[in-house]
């Protein structure tokens, strides 16, 4: 399941984020690469311990946890703190699958979901599409600044070469309360239907029944 969430941050907020990011010292992006990815990855990143990156990453996590569509789709249990990357001058990241397990200051997490928050407007760079291959085929993603895409970490994906301009983004992984992608998709679809019926002022008893089904499925499938 691939979910696009528009306007997680406003244009003004993105501009403020970029002012802070652009002033920092960027390093070789292979800092977070797995062994096989190092030959495919050419980009720049902020050090994960950079104080500005840490503060902005926390701001992103706080915003996402307050975003109903994100919470409904991801059912987040634990984040790998957001990182920041930059592509320019032909830099790229060839096809790869994200590492299944990552270490955080609080221990290990299983990477169920990956997310990219775009921080450059698409018209400001050529190339740089996030291309994701999943069960529904190949999808090419290039969203407006402040928008986010969420997708299974098991997906084969790449960032195509940035031929001109500059592509800046935040990226992150998270462990979901529900490990299985198919189960997460069903829960998301059910929750979205409940929200739609609530807005349409559907019969209270039917909403009560559907909400009960949702929570009982979540109770059955979640791992905490």
Swiss-Prot record:
One function term, GO molecular function aspect: 2-oxoglutarate-dependent dioxygenase activity
Keyword vocabulary terms for this entry: Dioxygenase, Iron, Metal-binding, Oxidoreductase, Vitamin C
Cofactor comment text: Binds 1 Fe(2+) ion per subunit.
UniProt EC number: 1.14.11.-
Top-rank taxon: Bacteria
UniProt cofactor(s): Fe(2+); L-ascorbate
Family matches, as InterPro entries: Oxoglu/Fe-dep_dioxygenase_dom, PKHD_C, PKHD_hydroxylase, Pro_4_hyd_alph, Pro_4_hyd_alph_FE2OG_OXY
Pfam families in the cross-refs: 2OG-FeII_Oxy_3 (PF13640), PKHD_C (PF18331)
Residues of the Fe2OG dioxygenase domain: 78-176
UniProt KW Transmembrane keyword: no
SMART domains: P4Hc
Chain positions recorded as Fe cation binding sites: 96, 98, 157
Chain positions recorded as 2-oxoglutarate binding sites: 167
EC category: oxidoreductase
Example GO BP: intracellular iron ion homeostasis
Protein name: PKHD-type hydroxylase Sbal223_0741
Organism: Shewanella baltica (strain OS223)
Lineage: Bacteria, Pseudomonadati, Pseudomonadota, Gammaproteobacteria, Alteromonadales
């Amino acid at each position: 399941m691939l979910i696009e969430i528009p306007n997680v941050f406003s244009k003004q907020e993105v501009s403020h984020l970029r002012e802070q990011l652009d002033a920092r010292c960027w390093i070789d992006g292979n800092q977070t690469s797995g062994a096989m990815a190092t030959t495919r990855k050419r980009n720049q990143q902020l050090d994960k311990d950079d104080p500005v990156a840490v503060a902005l990453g926390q701001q992103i996590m706080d915003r996402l946890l307050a975003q109903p569509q994100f919470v409904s789709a991801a059912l987040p249990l634990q984040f790998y703190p957001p990182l920041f990357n930059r592509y320019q001058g032909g830099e790229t990241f060839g096809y790869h699958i994200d590492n299944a397990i990552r270490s955080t200051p609080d221990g290990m997490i299983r990477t169920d979901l990956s997310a990219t928050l775009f921080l450059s407007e698409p018209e400001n760079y050529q190339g740089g599409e996030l291309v994701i291959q999943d069960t529904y085929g190949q999808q090419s993603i290039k969203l407006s600044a402040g928008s986010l895409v969420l997708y299974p970490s098991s997906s084969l994906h790449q960032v195509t070469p940035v031929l001109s301009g500059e592509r800046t983004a935040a990226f992150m992984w998270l462990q979901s309360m529900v490990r299985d992608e198919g189960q997460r998709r069903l829960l998301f679809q059910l929750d979205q239907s409940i929200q739609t019926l609530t807005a349409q002022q559907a019969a209270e008893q039917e909403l009560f029944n559907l909400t009960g089904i949702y929570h009982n499925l979540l109770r059955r499938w979640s791992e905490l």
